[in-house]
């Protein structure tokens, strides 16, 4: 296994060098071309599929997004296996210069290296590794690398759900922990709430009483709705974006607030939406109007029996090499594409085949643990061989 570390680090270095923020279409096009080239070199039939956000998306509103790369190869086995990861990262263009690829002890640093360049590197490494092992006892091997996961998979989610209904097993390569190695059987559902308040403008000095301050009403609604969350039940609502006013001496006539919502189950979102719609009926500023939109961005991943069989098999594979692998069966606030794959699954879905790391979605330098690399290609290839040949039943 140790001989896989340096080649995989070399792949990571090339991937990290290409900035691929979610709205950086040029960078995403460069990276998707590289990924397509690597998959074609491994004998996969590759499609580069353009994506677009739906017009009703509260933030993206029909925007063109980065393209997905989808590759397939037929084998002689019994089951179809799909590996998924995402090439886009949360950071904006130009931040790569502040976080170049470097290795310091057991830490390999780089922009997006943990979320999810490490996962992409593992997938690109696992496919030729299967060839080296001479293994083709799968009915079909599929790879999907999308480019919009960090913005809710607005253009790729439906396609991932379709593939989940066609493949016997879906392996998702998000990061596999930090202090401990694990695989996941649960992720949170995610929603976007947008609240638009309309009031009436007036001069802030001479006639503020004639205005209807949309900012005041927005503040009232935001503070009031904070208490609708329930951390003990995994329901979180956090207002993260606010826009109002343009001129200092004018009472603002409009205001917009956007919230990020996380829940353990899809039904929790239904209850929260109903509570929010009831809450906005209680207004502080008379003669203001409030428009609320509640967009379900990502479903929850809820494991089925097949997923649990896969998780236990992953533990057994780790035990073969004398290592421990935890199974996380409770969502902790993060959402992933495993949820889309698990909406109408043909078989099992398992999350977190990626590398252990730290710093994703934060101001800290992002890194993966070099010591976490060696077991992961072994886990991925063993899972493909066990599943593809029909060695697991559920």
Could you tell me what each predicted segment is?
Residues 84-85, 144-146, 171-174, 198, ...:
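Short beta-strand segments
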Residues 108-121, 150, 212-215, 367-374:
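Short, conserved micro-motifs enriched in small and acidic residues
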Residues 82, 108, 168-172, 194, ...:
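Short glycine-aspartate micro-motif
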Residues 99-113, 198-201, 322, 362:
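Glycine/charged-rich beta-loop-alpha catalytic/anionic-binding loops adjacent to active sites
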Residues 2-111, 132:
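Acidic/His- and Gly-rich active-site-bordering loop/insert found
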Residues 3, 20, 38, 91, ...:
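Metal-dependent amide/peptide-bond hydrolase catalytic core
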Residues 114-186, 230, 392-394:
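Acidic/histidine-rich catalytic neighborhood of metal-dependent amide-processing enzymes
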Residues 91, 97-101, 107-141, 343, ...:
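A structural preference for long, well-packed, hydrophobic secondary-structure segments
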């Amino acid at each position: 296994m140790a001989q896989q570390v340096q080649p995989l680090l070399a792949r990571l270095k090339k991937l990290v060098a290409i900035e691929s923020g979610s709205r950086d279409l040029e960078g995403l096009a460069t990276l998707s071309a590289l990924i397509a080239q690597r998959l074609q070199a491994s004998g996969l039939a590759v499609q580069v599929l353009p994506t677009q956000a739906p017009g009703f998306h509260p933030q993206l509103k029909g925007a063109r997004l980065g393209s997905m790369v989808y590759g397939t190869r037929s084998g002689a086995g019994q089951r179809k296996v799909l590996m998924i990861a995402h090439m886009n990262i949360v950071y904006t263009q130009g931040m790569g210069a502040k976080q170049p690829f470097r290795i310091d002890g057991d830490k390999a640093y780089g922009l997006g290296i943990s979320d999810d360049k490490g996962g992409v590197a593992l997938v690109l490494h696992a496919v030729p590794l299967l060839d080296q092992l001479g293994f083709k006892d799968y009915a079909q091997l599929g790879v999907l690398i999308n480019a919009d996961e960090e913005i809710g998979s607005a253009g790729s989610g439906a396609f991932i759900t379709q593939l989940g209904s066609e493949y016997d097993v879906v392996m998702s390569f998000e990061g596999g922990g930090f202090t401990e190695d694990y695989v996941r059987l649960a992720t949170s559902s995610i929603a976007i709430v947008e609240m638009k308040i309309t009031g009436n403008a007036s001069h802030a000095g001479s006639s503020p009483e004639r205005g209807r301050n949309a900012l005041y009403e927005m503040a009232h609604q935001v503070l009031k709705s904070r208490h609708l969350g329930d951390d003990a039940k995994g329901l979180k609502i956090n207002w993260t974006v606010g826009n109002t006013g343009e001129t200092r001496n004018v009472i603002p006539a409009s205001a917009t607030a956007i919230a990020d919502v996380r829940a353990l189950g899809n039904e929790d979102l239904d209850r929260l939406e109903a509570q929010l719609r009831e809450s906005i009926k209680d207004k502080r500023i008379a003669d203001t109007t409030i428009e609320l939109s509640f967009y379900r961005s990502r479903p929850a991943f809820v494991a089925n029996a097949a997923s649990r069989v896969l998780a236990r098999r992953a533990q057994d594979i780790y035990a073969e090499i004398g290592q421990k692998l935890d199974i996380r069966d409770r969502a902790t606030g993060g959402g992933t594409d495993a949820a889309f794959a698990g909406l109408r699954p043909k078989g099992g879905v398992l999350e977190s085949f990626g590398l252990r790391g730290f710093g994703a979605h934060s101001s800290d330098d992002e890194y993966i643990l070099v010591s976490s690399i060696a077991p992961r290609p072994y886990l991925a290839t063993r899972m493909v061989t066990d599943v593809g040949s029909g060695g697991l039943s559920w």
